A protein has these predicted regions:
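Bacterial N-terminal signal peptides
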Residues: 9-18
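Short, acidic/polar
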Residues: 56-71, 132-139, 196-201, 223-227, ...
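Amphipathic, heptad-repeat alpha-helical segments
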Residues: 319-371, 396-405
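Active-site groove signature of glycoside hydrolases
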Residues: 81-84, 118-125, 135-167
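N-terminal carbohydrate-binding accessory modules
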Residues: 23-78, 192
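Extracellular glycoside hydrolase catalytic/binding regions
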Residues: 141-144, 148, 158-277, 281-302
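Aromatic-lined substrate-binding rim segments of carbohydrate-active enzymes
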Residues: 63-121, 171-186, 254-262
Length: 405
């Protein structure tokens, strides 16, 4: 058996530890990750498919500050933000200051920052790895000493899609390489990998300090099962675990449902995403429009821990005081007039719309009050108003109290 000399043996141990995933990261600085209330962030005005690049190339401190104030109002305390390598290539001279402003703006609001490191040409061509080294050195020099930086996410969803397998294996090898690289260049900042699937989170567990999975399951049972598996593996691995992406109305993963299950399970989470990005994922994701209004108030309520009662409910009786009966009578009377007053018709429509929304008697995909507001803003269109009132009266009719005998 060949014997190692003392120095050779020491170097062998060091190299082995690093390559096996040994970490010196300051995990304790992250605090209790079960209390993480996070969000993925892209400005509402970013444009797909290069929205994560444009976020930095067209960086606006004013927009950032406004959006982060919205997050603070919801008591959110973590953010996950993408920094593509292409942004570095585009604005190498100014990117550092923009990153620092973002992290500082988050820090003063009590929001920790997870930076998702964009992939580069080295993923497919390992001869390009010197560019990855340059990239990681840049990021570390820019942010590692800054208060507010929580962790590096070294690759987003390397396991999605799951086919072809060769692609996934290549991505996993990149994750191992980037993990070793970050641990060499910035050993104190924790590392995570945003895995699309919990099962794959387990595969690269040795290369992270914080386990991370994403979940958009379409039933509570599936959500709970995924969380349970993640927690069980995390306990076995002795590492904290978070869910880095939740919430998508197009995947039957309502924000209020998934948030409630994660809160009950005491697992930290990051919603996708804070802003409604009109030319990105905004049709199926997001809490706030660019002006600070919301599409669905139940999402904001759920983030604050207030959930819909789905057990012992008390259905609303909207016509308890005759409001539905009156607006139906008023509406039919207005419709019967030859020269009906435009403003009176709008008032009838608005009253009907308010009853529909307040009693949750109408779908909110297009809010009835929005339809009325559109008519108020435009030129008088009697035919459109007549059709709207007819639609509202028809929707209200089933909820009219029967006449007393």
């Amino acid at each position: 058996m060949k014997m190692f000399k003392p120095l050779t043996a020491t170097l062998f141990i060091i190299v082995t530890l690093v390559y096996a995933g040994y970490s010196q990261a300051n995990i304790s600085a992250l605090g209790d990750l079960s209390k993480y209330r996070g969000f993925n962030y892209t400005p509402a005005g970013a444009v797909s498919p290069h929205h994560h690049i444009d976020q930095w190339v067209k960086y606006s401190a004013a927009v950032t500050n406004f959006d982060l104030d919205l997050a603070k109002r919801l008591n959110l305390n973590q953010v996950r933000v993408f920094v593509p390598y292409e942004a570095y290539l585009a604005i190498k001279d100014t990117l550092k200051d923009r990153l620092r402003h973002f992290v500082q703006a988050c820090h003063i609001r009590g929001i920790g920052v997870m930076v998702v490191v964009g992939k580069g040409p080295w993923v497919q061509d390992t001869s390009q790895r010197p560019r990855a080294i340059e990239w990681v050195k840049f990021l570390s020099a820019a942010l590692s000493s800054r208060p507010g930086l929580a962790m590096w996410d070294i690759m987003n969803e390397p396991d999605y899609p799951e086919k072809p397998l060769e692609r996934v294996q290549r991505n996993f090898e990149n994750c191992r390489f980037m993990s070793r690289l970050f641990r060499e260049i910035d050993p104190k900042t924790p590392i995570t990998i945003g895995m699309a699937f919990e099962k794959n989170m387990e595969t690269l567990a040795d290369y992270v300090d914080v386990l991370q999975f994403h979940d958009y399951s379409d039933t509570r049972e599936k959500i709970d099962q995924t969380i349970l598996r993640a927690k069980q593996f995390a306990a076995k691995a002795g590492k904290p675990v978070i869910d880095g992406e939740i919430g998508c109305i197009a995947r039957a993963n309502p924000y209020d449902v998934t948030l409630e299950e994660h809160m009950k399970a005491h697992v930290g989470w990051y919603i996708w995403e804070l802003m409604i990005v009109r030319k990105g994922w905004g049709a199926v994701h997001g809490v706030f429009y660019e002006d600070g209004t919301v599409r669905d108030p139940s999402i904001a309520a759920a983030i604050l821990g207030f959930f819909r009662n789905r057990n012992d409910i008390l259905p609303a009786i909207v016509d308890r005081e005759g409001a539905i009966t009156r607006v139906i009578d008023d509406g039919n009377g207005w419709l019967a007039q030859q020269d009906a007053d435009w403003k009176k018709g709008l008032d009838i429509a608005e009253t009907a719309a308010n009853l529909l929304e307040a009693g949750e008697l109408a779908p909110m995909h297009v809010p009835p009050t929005w339809e009325v507001a559109q008519l108020r803003r435009g030129q008088p269109d009697v035919h459109a108003l007549q059709n709207l009132i007819k639609k509202y009266l028809q929707a209200l009719a089933p909820f009219k109290k029967p006449a007393e005998k």
